[in-house]
Design a protein with these regions (language model features):
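Charged, low-complexity intrinsically disordered terminal segments
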Residues: 1-222
């Protein structure tokens, strides 16, 4: 197994405190099958945590959308190793499967536009019936917070699910600081009680759904 560090940290004990980490959780098999979502590779996904299971959401993708995942990995690999993964073996012909439109979006510190943040804002602004959200951390940008509040005030059924217990008490306290203003706008808030909710998903009007590794916080959007 060829393992390479992404932006290697000199002091590993500080790695979880520094910005510009690679937060993506993707798997591509033979350029034809992809997996994406919130799951890391760690014992806790099998063993759970002290207060219950580790609840996450990951999806399997086939068809041309796999190219998007392969491209994201290839760019990161090239950045880290200075090697190009451009051979046809990595991008084989892939037939269309099913009838669902899938778009792969990535964001990072490089680039003029924040594709994931903008897509969330557009989808939320276009909602007519409901917005259902699962996220382990809720530290929204001002624009995202206002978009959710406006939707709820416009009689859209907005529901937010967070973990009752968090792996980061500090982040949990920060997340809870936003909840009063959400409740005042009519947003319904639920707490997952069977363990730690690590899933990052949004479903809107049974027409739009996003599943990935983006938390609803300003750090993920940047």
């Amino acid at each position: 197994v060829d393992v390479r560090p992404f932006l290697k940290v000199t002091f590993p004990q500080l790695a979880n405190k520094l910005n510009y980490r690679n937060h993506r959780k993707i798997v591509i098999i033979d350029g034809k099958i992809g997996y994406v979502g919130g799951m890391n590779i760690a014992d806790r996904y099998q063993d759970g945590v002290a207060w219950g299971i580790w609840r996450d959401t990951h999806i399997r993708i086939t068809g041309p959308a796999v190219y998007g995942l392969q491209t994201a990995f290839s760019i990161d690999w090239s950045f880290t190793t200075r090697e190009l993964l451009s051979d046809n073996i990595y991008f084989p012909p892939v037939p269309r499967t099913g009838n669902i439109n899938v778009q792969i979006l990535t964001s990072g510190p490089i680039g003029e536009w924040k594709g994931i943040s903008l897509s969330f804002l557009k989808a939320i602004s276009n909602a007519k019936q409901h917005i259902f959200i699962q996220t382990p951390y809720f530290l929204p940008t001002e624009s995202l917070m206002k978009a959710l509040q406006v939707a709820a005030l416009s009689k859209v059924d907005v529901r937010l699910m967070l973990p009752e217990k968090s792996d980061s008490p500090i982040l949990q306290l920060a997340s809870h600081s936003y909840l009063t203003s959400m409740l005042k706008a009519g947003i319904k808030i639920y707490f997952y009680q069977n363990g730690f909710l690590h899933a990052k998903s949004i479903t809107i009007d049974n027409e739009f759904s996003t599943i990935g590794s983006t938390n609803l916080d300003f750090r993920s959007f940047d």
